[in-house]
């Protein structure tokens, strides 16, 4: 079934672009993300694309104060899973493009101490990068997205 999925995903150049350019993505996961979220032209900016995955933080306003809350989970749970799995795959990389993501996550964990929150933040950065890659054709710059 994997060969069949790869054959079907190969018919869409956007899926191939995600699988080749983005760290941590295989052809199946790229196909899942593209199938769940559709064309990035549907979203007016990268924040809207990230919001469709449910990876953006929720907020609560009361008494003139705004509090950041946990992620909204308002989007596609399958796409959210794919982006977090891509980050977890990068955490296993010691060399190559995933190593930059790993270094950023480790640096943030030393500062914030909560690994799950850092993984979600990295997944949101990947989601925004996918939107820029497909909507504008802009190459994903790991050093800009994940400075260490």
Show where each model-derived region lies.
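A detector of single, family-specific signature residues
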Residues: 1-148
């Amino acid at each position: 079934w994997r060969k069949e999925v790869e054959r079907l995903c190969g018919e869409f150049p956007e899926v191939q672009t995600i699988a080749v350019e983005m760290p941590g993505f295989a052809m199946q996961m790229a196909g899942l993300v593209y199938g769940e979220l559709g064309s990035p032209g549907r979203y007016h900016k990268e924040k809207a694309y990230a919001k469709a995955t449910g990876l953006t933080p929720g907020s609560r306003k009361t008494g003139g104060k705004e509090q950041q809350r946990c992620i909204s989970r308002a989007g596609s749970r399958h796409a959210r899973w794919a982006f977090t799995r891509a980050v977890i795959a990068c955490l296993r990389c010691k060399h190559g493009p995933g190593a930059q993501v790993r270094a950023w996550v480790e640096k943030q964990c030393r500062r914030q101490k909560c690994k799950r929150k850092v993984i979600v933040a990295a997944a949101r950065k990947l989601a925004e990068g996918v939107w820029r890659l497909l909507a504008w054709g802009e190459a994903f710059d790991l050093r800009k997205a994940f400075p260490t």
